[in-house]
């Protein structure tokens, strides 16, 4: 499989920003990503879906609030 850097190359700037935010901040909810990146909720959702397609981001259910998902960089 190609490196994360190679998989990031053809993604939109919003996806790269979300990736870098997760790299710097660690695990975040979508709401936290919206706040940190200052992107719209819709744009963050799209960026996350693109990152998941490239297997760069993983999601899991939050233990504090099962309605929320936590996103982190894939290992």
Identify the meaning behind each predicted range.
Residues 39-50, 66:
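Short amphipathic alpha-helical interaction segments
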Residues 4-15, 29, 59-75:
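Short, cationic-aromatic polyanion-contact patches
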Residues 15-22:
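Hydrophobic residues on short alpha-helical segments
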Residues 55:
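Glycine-centered, phosphate/nucleic-acid-interacting loop/turn motifs that mediate DNA/RNA or nucleotide
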Residues 27-36:
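Short acidic, hydrophobic short linear motifs in intrinsically disordered regions
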């Amino acid at each position: 499989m190609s490196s994360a850097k190679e998989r990031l190359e053809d993604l939109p700037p919003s996806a790269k920003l979300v990736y870098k935010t997760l790299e710097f901040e660690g695990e975040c909810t979508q709401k936290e990503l919206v706040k940190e990146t200052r992107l719209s909720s819709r744009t963050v959702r799209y960026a996350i879906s693109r990152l998941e397609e490239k297997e760069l981001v993983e999601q899991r259910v939050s233990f504090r609030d099962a309605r929320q998902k936590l996103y982190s960089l894939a290992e």
